[in-house]
């Protein structure tokens, strides 16, 4: 049997959820052809890249301007300033984003000093708060923290002007924590990050692939449920009944144990 195991967005970047590795090893030990795709980290690299940020700023520009104007009208000068600063420094963010990720991965040492001290390195509110809190001259020992805050600042921009469901460690968590109908949850499948960025991740990973016999989607937390549904829908739209889609994981075991929503059958074949 040909099996694909998927970790959907979004889980902690610095502590990957291990279920995919365990499941892959389990199936391989049974003699199956199995591979694991961590689409959570894939989405991060898709979004936080030169191409990704260029597209983000293009898609969000008009909305950002409107929200900045509204914030100023409402007397929220700080929000208006921060949103406009993202737009005015977008070229710096785009130029630096690949190096920021390299620094976070411990591979960008030649850029660390420049990222700390260059007047052209991007800055956001979280980064400035961190630097001000040091009460000393920053050093290369601080650079990875600063890079982490850079991603957090970008995430704040995304949440404020582009996709209110986005977070670095979860996506649309409230949709499954609150009491909402499944139809309401389905409407959120077309939210911006899913539509414009996660769809590209799925296409890059699977558009040229043959149909697997089974797709196992691990859902450890509520904040991965909506992307998991989006993933399941992609496979069903592409392969129809030829693919058997299963969901499982911590969230499924605790929150979906007694699920009776018939519409879920459009996306999956089984719950484990």
What do these predicted ranges mean?
Residues 2-12:
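Nucleotide-activated donor-dependent transferases that construct or modify glycoconjugates
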Residues 10-13, 18-19, 23-52, 93, ...:
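Glycine-rich beta-alpha loop elements in corrinoid/cobalamin-binding modules
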Residues 46-106, 120:
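Conserved phosphoryl-transfer catalytic core
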């Amino acid at each position: 049997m040909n099996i694909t195991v998927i970790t959907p967005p979004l889980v902690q970047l610095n502590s990957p959820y291990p279920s995919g590795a365990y499941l892959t090893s389990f199936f391989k030990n049974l003699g199956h052809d199995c591979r694991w795709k961590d689409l959570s980290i894939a989405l991060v690299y898709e979004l936080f890249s030169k191409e990704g940020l260029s597209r983000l700023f293009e898609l969000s520009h008009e909305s950002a301007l409107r929200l900045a104007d509204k914030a100023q009208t409402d007397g929220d000068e700080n929000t208006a300033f921060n949103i406009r600063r993202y737009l005015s420094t977008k070229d710096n963010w785009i130029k630096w984003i690949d190096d920021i990720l390299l620094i976070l991965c411990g591979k960008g040492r030649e850029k660390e000093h420049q990222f700390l001290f260059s007047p052209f390195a991007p800055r956001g509110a979280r980064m400035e708060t961190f630097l001000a809190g040091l009460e000393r001259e920053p050093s290369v020992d601080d650079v990875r923290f600063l890079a982490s805050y850079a991603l957090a600042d970008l995430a704040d921009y995304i949440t404020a002007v582009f996709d209110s469901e986005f977070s670095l460690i979860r996506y649309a968590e409230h949709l499954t924590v609150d009491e909402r109908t499944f139809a309401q949850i389905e409407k959120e499948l077309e939210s911006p990050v899913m539509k414009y960025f996660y769809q590209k991740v799925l296409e890059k990973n699977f558009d040229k692939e043959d149909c697997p016999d089974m797709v196992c989607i691990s859902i450890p937390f509520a904040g991965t449920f909506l992307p998991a549904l989006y993933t399941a829908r992609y496979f069903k739209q592409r392969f129809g009944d030829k693919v058997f889609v299963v969901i499982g994981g911590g969230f499924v075991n605790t929150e979906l144990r007694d699920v009776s929503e018939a519409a879920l059958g459009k996306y999956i074949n089984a719950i484990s």
